[in-house]
Amino acid sequence: MTGRKTAGKKAAGGLPEPAPAARQRFRRTLLRWYDRNGRDLPWRRTDDPYHILVSEIMLQQTQVDRVLPKYHEWLGKFPSFHALADAGEEAAVRTWYPLGYNIRPRRLHAIAREAVASYGGRLPDDEATLRSFKGIGPYTAGALMSFAFRRRAPILDTNVARVLFRVIVGRGDLKSHRMKRHLWKVSALMVPHRRAFDFNQAIMDFGALVCTARRPKCEGCPMSGMCRAYPFDPASGDAPR
């Protein structure tokens, strides 16, 4: 199978890592696809860290089409960290409705209060300090570094993990801690020095639109020639093999 050529070596744990040529091929293929098919979303038209944080917290466990109207409503009511911190936690929870998972607006409000109290209503632009905020984990910190501060930073949400697992690794337990650690390493290797912002947006879109969880569009997929899970078997899914 041609897809077996994607990985160039194995990491210390025995999991495949992409060789430099495979990384370049993956990047070119993904960015070419994104230039034609990428989604036009409002949080991609801003580098305001607050706006991007709001979108990232909302998108946790909630589909894009449900987030879009609430994102605009939220920013209309709470346009800044200062406005959110001043509004109070219960106002944030009420405005969040009906997105659910109400721990999210409470965390967002707590982040706003800390940003106002300690950083003048801004977010710091280094990953370690971002991760010191309660409610900002590795993915959200990476997303802020990439999308708000335009740094070359890896991300690993559900969509990104699925794409990298299928194309680069191909077998194993996607949900294991060992695999997640490995995929973070792969994500860091994959992010290019140029167009890092576009690359991270592209891989999320690719996972959402093509390399989906249950019924990926393998037929005609631009990654099929390098994908180690191609053709994907819906019966086995991403279970250990």
Map each language-model feature to its residues.
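Polybasic, lysine-enriched low-complexity intrinsically disordered terminal tails
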Residues: 1-17, 238-239
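Catalytic cores of DNA base-excision repair glycosylases
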Residues: 15-22, 28-29, 33-235
